[in-house]
Amino acid sequence: MIKIIFSILSLYVFSTLTLADEDLENEAVKLLQAYLKVDTISPPGNESRAVDFLAKIFDEEGIEYDSAESAPTRGNIWARIKGGDKPALILLHHSDVVPANEEYWDFDPLSGEIVDGYIQGRGALDMKGLGISHLANFLKLHRSNKSLNRDLIYIAVSYTHLTLPTKRIV
């Protein structure tokens, strides 16, 4: 079985929506591998590539979203599942990654390769892995058509490894 490192917080928050569902787990593995291949190394960032990747998924799922750039090519995206009147729960991750010194890697750091049962690649732990964990649960809730007591907002922000102009967007 492929071992995926997901945020303990994410699994705690969604304890009733775990990734025990094999189809969802397989989908999450493929999504993470694909997301790791999206080059968002900062500098220069190019997080708009991550926005395009996530927007395609939202389009396929029929999920409305918005996006904006905090600077040229520094894209941010957010989507919402409407719920009740309680304060919204925000699922936030950043889509930029730091440069990889390839001499310390046995494979392409943007490959999303599975090594010894683990998905490897720049951003797997910080923070694209968390982003896909959030996304898998966000998609599961969207597909379930369950009534929520609060809005659930998925956000991918840019530009965290240099400065934080993203605060204008959020």
Feature map (PLM): residue ranges:
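Sec-dependent signal peptide recognition
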Residues: 1-8
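Acidic/His- and Gly-rich active-site-bordering loop/insert found
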Residues: 21-124, 128, 138-151
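Conserved small/polar residues in nucleotide/adenosyl-binding loops
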Residues: 160-166
